[in-house]
């Protein structure tokens, strides 16, 4: 379930922008066939984002065929009777046979008969592949420089999306409309295996299991109780005819929207849209089902041993999308959780709980109010606080809401947070896309995008109290989870016995015609480093100043030239400072400090990496003086309660204690060990005894020391440079910054296999690592071309060989990674996530790729276009310009990399890719880093393939001993 904080509300439909944002550039209309068209010009966007939004998702599936919506999303990348068709007349009877065979397969319960039918389906699929081009759809997108070709399925919608240059508007509209006309669901059997892989990827993740169980209980009796991906039983019993039926029912123009946002001309686009999308034929939609509300009468409770740590959820009845109380209920939940000053946020700030938050989850048919908490962990007692005690703490705040005991200042400050969020939403192209999509999916007026903020600002306390009482003074369900110490295996889907398809991949007639379709001249625009004014404003103090002409919200980052490498305890001081108050002031407690900042429309956070200490501040320029006053006082006289210190220490204690049982952390630690050896983040970490001894005096001295080093100021706002400098906390005699710390990579001069056995893992993780050259920008274009050839989406060699042909994995890639600075090591980094019983096959195929790269020069034009488009759209946001330009300059660029590399991109050839491969990959020793179920992996076969012994790695090798934790607290 979504955990929605106010900062994330910009991505949720029904939330408004500031009144200053107008309809300028926005066009909405319908074609005669009922297709909704939503166009929003944004000429500061680097490209164009295009969506097809379908008002159908997992809730619209028949109960006996779950997973259809998600599986259909996968299949709509497989082409049509034109896209991907080499000879449709020959292909059609084979396709019809596959549909018929799947019907028989679904109806049969005899294992032998089903096995025979599966073999026949596989044989037909291989025959169909010979008369089709599996990659056609992706090659077409590569031709136009489309990026981020993707889709997603939720309960209420399915969306297909990517970005593309405006010069390719006509061809993009052509292929995006064509994909919806007579689609052909090729390689259905193989793609089902990819869905199996996706299912298995989450099946043994305890966190995913917790969320799945919540869904089942919270939405009992409604399709929302089902997992979007479908049940194992239904996934094992597919029926292609039902997929076709689902498409024919819901994928009709009167149930879809075309959403285009970005740097384009809407008037030019309209006739193109008419020509391409008016081809879709409308149909009458079936009546949607309705579902009775679940009763929480009697305050039912449920308990499960599931997950990594205790967790409690209290669930109230909410409202569905479009309900008259929806917006007011959102606001009430923001009074509890907004990331800064909510009633539950204060519990987090004080250290009373490990985490607590609330949100309203409104959906098409129903809604829920979710209150969730993780209890406080006491490192002294080495246990979590009881559910009963945690409930008392959380429900005390809920009682305030329920009883209307809501402070006027809190209401005013939350309104201020909303208003400021909507101001900055104007800068966000993604917000515009999501707002339009949500408006369509939930039949909300487009005008709400522009008027909702006015609604929130005019919301009265009486209305807030009415809604709070109505929904919180009601029965609720309690669901609690305790850590599952047994780690039970979830149901996973078996490896089928199918042969890989061998598509022809000749060029189709549609592809040939597509090449000739008109496109406009590619518009080259480049970033100008002079957009950021750089000046020295003191000894070892540099200002990077970016003017903000859009609104009065500033962002200010103070970056000091020392980090965790030199001061290992600094990250913990930073974590504590984010919740600190000011000693001896009205803002003594952290919650009071946050309240004062909120009254100024401001926020501050602290962070640290290996090389730098950061203070990040945002707020309204008109309040800069007061904001900086508060921040300076907090830095000079921080106040921390003992429980805040204990909460951070307890969090670190539990994380280190439990991480050896977490598969995601295990694989991260194994990879860190392979890449950095003893300098792994999990081995070269602060002794817990040092953290345990951390107190307020030490925090103060750490801050004072960090702030004595060179300062880089990154500002984006509307103040003049002189006014800004007058407000900055500048001191004399700042020391030179410490050198940037970049870890050295491990060197492997022979093939190596590092294996961490995990008998509980169905999902295996395979990493491939090859030491590379010292980094220099001169190799960027060749490296980029190689990466595009290897992992440029589904048409890349790795995805094509591993997933598209053989269905071995849901995720697979291989790229050349740049060194962090000139002279630092580059390296090849590859990955395959697959079932343990497919590991040997996946390693064999991947090693064959690395040993002898498949050669296909036919796509070099598309690779060139992709490189050009990627370079052209690497345009940072207004607030990101300063840091991005600095990064490019550190790498060695004196201007926009797109400009420097333009000629090299135009001239790149397939021989450049071959040369890069020969110099950096071919014949180099490969290190494989592997974790999975040892009973399902043939280690001897891996040794034979690599020509080396497999080195088994234990947790003791990649983690520090937990004994240091107990020694510290004794």
Map each language-model feature to its residues.
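A common structural junction motif
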Residues: 178-186, 277-284, 395-406, 632-640, ...
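Proteolytic maturation boundary segments
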Residues: 20-39, 265-304, 311, 317, ...
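Bacterial Sec-dependent N-terminal signal peptides
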Residues: 1-22
